Amino acid sequence: LGIAERCIEIMCEYSMKHRDAFSKKLSEFGQIQRLIADSYTEWSAARSLVYSVASGINPENRNSLGAASAKLAATRMAENVSRNAIQVLGGYGYCREYPAERLHRDAILLSIGGGTNEAMMKNIVSDLRRIYGV
């Protein structure tokens, strides 16, 4: 969640305060607005899911289905949002002087560490098979 939140901050700062194109702030262009709005919406939804699942976990209720679903959703979201940040920054998105490229690399790592996204999907289906008696 933190990677995506920082990417949203970077997109807003850059497009609303620092970058002009054709005598307008970058954030006044529809495609940039869509990237920022989509990023915030994805982040907000993933945050709600993660917090909801985390608040219900205790020693008696591990909720592995919820945990795997939340990790999968959050890592996918972080990759999408960090990719959007690179898009908003354009060529600067690839430069090491801007943090977007590092954040994107870190977001990709999230889908590997702590259980790959593929492992999370396998766990989700395994839990659903158990729930539905298959």
Residue ranges and their predicted role:
Residues 1-134:
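Alpha-helical interface subdomain recognition
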